Amino acid sequence: MAISRLLVEKFRNLTAVDLDFDPCFNFLIGNNGSGKTSLLEAIFYLGHGRSFKSAVTNRIISYDEPHFTLFGQIQESQHQWSIGLQKLRQGNTLVKINGEDGNKISDLAHLLPMQLITPEGLTLLNGGPSYRRAFLDWGLFHHQTSFYSAWSNLNRLLKQRNAALAQNQPYSAIKIWDVELAKLAHQVSEWRAEYAEALSPEIEQTCQLFLPELEINVSFHQGWEKNADYYEILQQNFERDRALNYTFSGPQKADFRFKAQGLPVEDVLSRGQLKLLMCALRLAQGEHLMKEKQRHCIFLIDDFASELDQYKRALLAERLQQSGSQVFVTAITQRQLKEMQVENKKMFSVHNGIINALN
């Protein structure tokens, strides 16, 4: 999958953008605040219907404008699509695929599998379990066709159950939801466990390349006692859940944990090592998608050079090139990209929201 053309209007500080991209590497060069991260954000938004920088729409739409518009032409093998997204200041989102209305953001997400590597992305390792659940669920969204429907229904039932608990309703009023909730919980957990098991060897292998001095181990935890029946857990813990006003145990508490030398990685690794581990996770997941589904991710890498020495930057560049994926990389100077010795590339300068091709 690759974006061949991108149009951006009224998005942050970017002047109207109309760019053609290389299917391999695209480098965005500019000072801090110039708009290069905003372009990555626009690409990410086109594939996710949300920002990785802000949840507040009014901060993303250009000042005094009613909406922003994103349009992309994408291609994969012999197939081509035209996709568009418009976000209104009052919150509505309009999605078009090949000129047709009525599409969902999930349709865009399926067309554009993306891996994001940013300085803030270390929350995957040192943040709460929700970040690691999202990592697993991203993979399942692209690998298991029934996952998104099951995941959506699971979250809907959990919200309904929690609302009933907060209203102090008796178990007789909640029991009807618990049967279906338990069924979905077991299915989602089974998928997560299978995906984690399939991905773990690739993660550990990639970690050996980036962090050979460490032994990295991964493990999946489903969010309730292993081998226990979740329906029985819901029954047994009803009074506790009602006192808490929410469902304490379940797939909403699942985690995908990483340890180095037997200890949590956030307690052992330096910030630079954590970034390398994050890169290893994203690369392994993208390569797993290619191996299993013959689909390439698009990699978005913000501030490529930060916290990586010259050797590790060269290693990351080589692995990205081997992946065959389309890659977007930001840097302050071309010098920071000297390890990116690639034949197929385009270079862009970014200054005060204006983006120009350099080659």
Swiss-Prot record:
Instruction: State where ATP binds.
Output: 30-37
| Any one of the GO BP annotations | DNA synthesis involved in DNA repair
Gene Ontology CC, one term = cytoplasm
- The answer to whether the entry has keyword Cell division is no
Q: SUPFAM superfamilies under this entry?
A: P-loop containing nucleoside triphosphate hydrolases (SSF52540)
Which regions form coiled coils? none
Pfam families according to UniProt: SMC_N
Which PROSITE patterns does UniProt cross-reference here? RECF_1, RECF_2
GO molecular function: any one?
ATP binding
The keyword ATP-binding appears for this protein = yes
- Tell me the InterPro entries matching this sequence: DNA-binding_RecF, DNA-binding_RecF_CS, P-loop_NTPase, RecF/RecN/SMC_N, RecF_2
Which compartments does it reside in? Cytoplasm
- Identify the domain of life: Bacteria
Q: Which NCBIfam families match?
A: recf (TIGR00611)
Q: Which family does it belong to?
A: Belongs to the RecF family.
Name of the molecule in the record: DNA replication and repair protein RecF
The protein's gene is named: recF
